[in-house]
Amino acid sequence: MRFLHILILLIFNYNSFSQEFSFFNADFSATSLSLGGNVITKSDDISLTYKTTSLLNQSQINHIAFDYLSLSNEINLFSFVYANELKKFGMYNIGVKNLNYGNFQGYDANGFQTNEFHANDLMFFTGISKMIIKDLTLGLNLELLNSNYESFSALAIASNTSLTYNDKKRKLIFSISLNNVGKQIDGFTDIKEKIPTSLKFGMSKSLNHLPFTYYISLHDLQRFDISGPVQASQSYRDDETILKKMFYHVNIGGELNPFKKNLFLRFGFNFQKRYQMMLRNIPQLAGFSSGVGIKFSSFSLDYAIISNHISSVSNVFSLKMNLSSFVPNGKKD
């Protein structure tokens, strides 16, 4: 079962010819995942700023966020991000992300047991954003990724560049993000692997007469065919029409804020996950996601449940806090 979870993780973090640094594309935010994933246009979620740094804004001054994703009893993802302001330079963030695969039993070439070993990915990141003209913000960040599997390790560095247009009067946001432009410093082998570069575009719009916001996210636009390295059978490959390959790039989601209070109900749909992970003639929810968020005066809680496959469901939790609210006479948003 743990192998299945790892396989699913590799497939949906895959967008280059390399899987060695697929962790660069891991999405940890409960808000984003409940809206279908790859969301880059939600300006009130600090967790999204690790890739789309242009989403940083003054409402996030002295804010902190923790994200936790459980794929199984042993495979867990954790992230932390902090944001604040540099008055002359704009906003900045700093954080860490970790994917723990757990412990594995080692075997030699003859099938005899050796020592247990551990596998994990660890990423450090920092970024800065600044409004360059009215409503348009530029964001830049750097990431350092270290992977350790048994006695093998790999190291890579990459950068992300993003632009966000936020028209508050029209309640409309557009973002474009070029992710993972970098190089391998050290690899598991002598072969130099490619960093999985990704181009994303997103938009969101809040309706004027209904407390509802819809999200459209387009991912991996640098390459048309992202049908993936794994095909269940030749019949599945034959079914890969041009239209279906186009929809592989699309995630959609919606957020309802009932009575305009502090409760948020979310749902999303991931076309690629639906097409590639569903089993024919068997009812299932692969590709669908949902979640709920509750906002308090000084912190908010978010939860998402994602159906990856008929036998795999992920639970994601996010906690975001305004640290200034816990300091007497501190600066509040």
Model-derived features: where do they sit?
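Positively charged n-region of N-terminal signal peptides that target proteins for export
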Residues: M1-L4, K134
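Sec/Tat signal peptide C-region and signal peptidase I cleavage site
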Residues: Y14-S18
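Subset of outer-membrane beta-barrel
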Residues: Q19-D333
